[in-house]
Design a protein with these regions (language model features):
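Structural detector for short beta-strands of small beta-barrel domains
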Residues: 2-21, 51, 58
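Short nucleic-acid-contacting surface segments enriched for D/E, G, S/T with interspersed K/R
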Residues: 42-57
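Short beta-strand segments
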Residues: 5-7, 33-36, 68
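OB-fold (S1/OB) nucleic-acid-binding surfaces
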Residues: 21-37
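OB-fold/S1-family single-stranded nucleic acid-binding modules
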Residues: 62-80
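Low-complexity, Gly/Pro
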Residues: 1-3, 16, 34, 75-80
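A short, sequence-level motif marking secondary-structure junctions
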Residues: 12-13, 39-44
Length: 80
């Protein structure tokens, strides 16, 4: 399902637990698009790189609310 794509953007936090730990991240692109990061193993690794730029490849789907979700196959943290 979905289409394979590569996006670039800032890794941003989107959900937290009661203690303020980040549970989920998104990639915010220069085009003001937000891609929620699926909670697979690679996606969870991206949480370590909050507020850094990354190039992320994976399958993109749209959920029933119209939000874009990327299931991360591979990623690369970019130098500024």
């Amino acid at each position: 399902e979905g289409r394979l794509a590569t996006i670039r953007g800032l890794v941003t936090p989107v959900t937290w637990d009661d203690k303020g730990n980040v549970l989920a991240a998104a990639i915010s692109t220069h085009f003001e698009e937000e891609y929620l990061v699926d909670d697979n193993a690679r996606g969870e690794e991206l949480i370590a790189f909050l507020r850094q730029r990354a190039k992320v490849s994976g399958f993109i789907i749209q959920n029933e609310n119209g939000k874009k979700i990327i299931s991360v196959e591979k990623y690369e943290v970019l130098e500024d």
